[in-house]
């Protein structure tokens, strides 16, 4: 899809289709009023006859409107003018794109970016339109012998902005939106791959492909032999039952003017399949445990977006690839593991494995002398119970970092909600035989998991994103969502000090 911005009046547009908004009840937006005036009341007459009420998502396609140069005019219901919010705006854009494809239009000029959305500027509206469009066009059929027959003739979409001085803002919004969309698509593609293809080595190969096309990015891997030398016994224990070797992929992006500038480190849990190990999961929906590498998919997608944007910062992305399988060689409940940090962990349940991988990675990243560390993981079902599918769980021992991430989530529409990380919860991890257990019991499961990780992240500013509820959808729309790529990319854009709005 090709995107561009322009600033012009609707009567001068010669495109295949013009897209304008209509409010409820039957109220023309400013641009629609201009078209109505040009057409001598043609549009308002249709509305008076009840052809369109203006409810959110309603569509009415008009052909050969009098005195209008464009072949078609698409009227889009936008609801009540003062109630148009971010969620409705995204839904309207998605419905518009689907309708345009149904009409057979190859190009369109969209004036919906001129609508008033509460608390949002032109930059946000254009960027969100790009991301919503790309998201609506996504499909994963790489492994189907018969590809989908979906009709998608739309090739070019032009967003109109109110004034010429906003053209630069619009162009920047398209650039950022395309980068986020590219990263989100890679995240979804990698996460949707089946576990017989997407194993830890596959994650590494995907990272190398990005590095081949971006000179600022280098990729190295740490295999099991090197992990053993480093003392990453907790990480190794989790993968011991699998035929697929555990591989930690290290992606180093150097974009700062000063190459010695401290990097931001992103860590992604990469359990390419999680059977639960000896503490075997129930069979129902176990196929979805291929998504237990959603954190790593989010990091690799964010690293691609970062490379596309060429942000002037240094970032290290870690893909903690591993597979948790039952076998005679698998680790067991009751085992006590000595982590890379030297702390010991009593294993109460082998299905609480993500934290055992991440704890060693959080120790490993100390060598980068990081500015800060953010880990992202599909860590706990408890977070899904607490927050559902709308917000990722955010935990942090550093208030400024937590606020930055929350703000990035609000800006990008990929929201998070901060959870407590109080000392009282640490008591749930006490063990009579080791420094701690790997499970805090059923109460506050997402919090105690984050408390566990916090014990290995004391030498830098750290935050943890639990994306177990947001990384993928179940049911009829099963598949990766691409989150938290928008949040993490926005966080990096903000950190880089890149100009965004007006």
UniProtKB/Swiss-Prot annotation:
EC number of the protein: 3.4.11.1, 3.4.11.10
Source organism superkingdom: Bacteria
GO CC, alphabetical: cytoplasm
Organism, as annotated: Shewanella loihica (strain ATCC BAA-1088 / PV-4)
Entry binding sites for Mn(2+) 1: 274, 351, 353
HAMAP family according to UniProt: Cytosol_peptidase_M17
Gene this chain is encoded by: pepA
Protein name, per record: Probable cytosol aminopeptidase
Lineage of the organism: Bacteria, Pseudomonadati, Pseudomonadota, Gammaproteobacteria, Alteromonadales
Keywords: Aminopeptidase, Cytoplasm, Hydrolase, Manganese, Metal-binding, Protease
Entry-linked InterPro entries: Leucine_aapep/pepB, Macro_dom-like, Peptidase_M17_C, Peptidase_M17_leu_NH2_pept, Peptidase_M17_N
Enzyme class: hydrolase
